[in-house]
Swiss-Prot record:
Key words, A-Z: ATP-binding, Helicase, Hydrolase, Nucleotide-binding, RNA-binding
The family this protein is said to belong to: Belongs to the DEAD box helicase family. DDX21/DDX50 subfamily.
Species of the source: Helianthus annuus
Domain note: The Q motif is unique to and characteristic of the DEAD box family of RNA helicases and controls ATP binding and hydrolysis.
Recorded superkingdom: Eukaryota
Name of the protein: DEAD-box ATP-dependent RNA helicase 3
Stated induction or repression of this protein's expression: Down-regulated in response to mixed metal ion contamination (cadmium, copper, lead and zinc), but not in response to zinc ion contamination.
Record's keyword annotation contains Zinc: no
């Protein structure tokens, strides 16, 4: 019968694999070892964050980032992320404190804790005048948190790892330093010959993202020549 066949099949499998390997019962609770708990050269730790695991136990997972001479990771990059996490929790609670969350968002966007409007105004960042004019035409008069956090390290040529929610200006965050440098080079070499090799290469994982990156660079700097290259099209 079918039941007898299954019993025989289970017996054969158990005899080959071993019953002890099929049913393993831990003799004592297993604890997770948070990575990079002890100080290590070349790493800087971020504040631990609680995560729930199976069985009700919890562990503190500590994120870390390389802090080499030419690399940087700014705590300002994660300031907005903490606010978005707060927004999610407020939605779960029914949204009673949405106004409080919006006030905190406005404080960050207005430069709260890191400078005022004058400091974040694009006209006071040392950007080329024609770049400032095109940004202002698009309604961009001051930087968002992610843009503020990466601007100086990017202009210094340092490696950056940052994260922010969709729609918070991540693409323009790295596009502004690129446009600034290319514009200044063009102004210093007005008589240089055309037909040079590409000076900047931006890699994107998808065709749609590649098009988006080109748009974000081309709109504030129409005087620069950009080319979007992708495959998969007949």
């Amino acid at each position: 019968t079918r039941g007898g066949y299954l019993n025989k099949f289970t017996t054969v499998v158990a005899s080959i694999i071993g019953v002890s390997s099929l049913y393993k019962v831990p003799t004592k609770p297993t604890t997770l070892s948070p990575p990079f708990i002890s100080p290590k050269p070349g790493f800087m730790s971020l504040p631990p964050r609680k995560h729930e695991v199976v069985g009700g136990a919890s562990s503190s997972l500590v994120a870390a980032a390389v802090s080499a001479r030419n690399s940087v990771i700014s705590e300002d990059l994660f300031e907005g992320l903490a606010l978005f996490d707060k927004a999610s929790s407020l939605e779960d609670d029914g949204g009673d404190n949405v106004s409080e969350f919006q006030a905190s968002i406005d404080d960050v966007n207005d430069g709260g804790g890191g400078g005022g409007d004058d400091e974040l105004a694009v006209s006071r960042l040392g950007l080329p005048q024609k770049l400032v004019e095109t940004l202002e035409k698009r309604g961009i008069t001051k930087l968002f948190p992610i843009q503020r956090a990466v601007l100086v390290p990017a202009l210094e040529g340092r490696d950056i790892i940052g994260r922010a929610k969709t729609g918070t200006g991540k693409t323009l965050a790295f596009a502004i330093p690129i446009i600034k440098r290319l514009t200044e080079e063009d102004e210093d070499n007005r008589n240089s010959l055309a037909g040079r090799l590409p000076r900047v290469l931006v890699l994107a994982p998808t065709r749609e993202l590649a098009k988006q990156v080109e748009t974000e660079i081309k709109e504030p700097a129409p005087y620069l020549r950009t080319v979007c290259v992708y495959g998969g099209v007949s």
